[in-house]
């Protein structure tokens, strides 16, 4: 929660500690510049779009450390996201759609 994040931030920063407190989102990924790109992209796709993003551990926020990291992630994720097939999932034999609308 935001209240917990504010408490952690104020307590740690009062002691000169470097802090990142991101309490408003349910889950987030922090991607460092030296991250394995293939593993990171696969984890983001599964976490963000698996179960149509509706499970309790879904990944709604990705924080890329550094502008280069962000640009690389965007370039790698964009074609994969655009290729997702969204449509009705209740029809028998519907193997074309990867996820239904939520």
Model region roles, listed by residue range:
Residues 2-102:
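ALDH superfamily catalytic-core signature
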């Amino acid at each position: 929660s935001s209240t917990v994040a504010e408490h952690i931030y104020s307590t740690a920063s009062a002691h000169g500690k470097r802090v990142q407190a991101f309490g408003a989102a349910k889950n987030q990924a922090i991607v460092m510049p030296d991250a394995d790109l293939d593993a990171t992209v696969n984890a983001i796709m599964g976490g963000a779009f698996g179960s149509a993003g509706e499970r309790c551990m879904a990944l709604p926020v990705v924080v890329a450390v550094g502008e280069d990291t962000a640009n690389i992630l965007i370039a790698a994720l964009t074609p994969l996201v655009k290729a997702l097939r969204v449509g009705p999932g209740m029809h028998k034999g519907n193997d074309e759609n990867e996820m239904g609308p939520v």
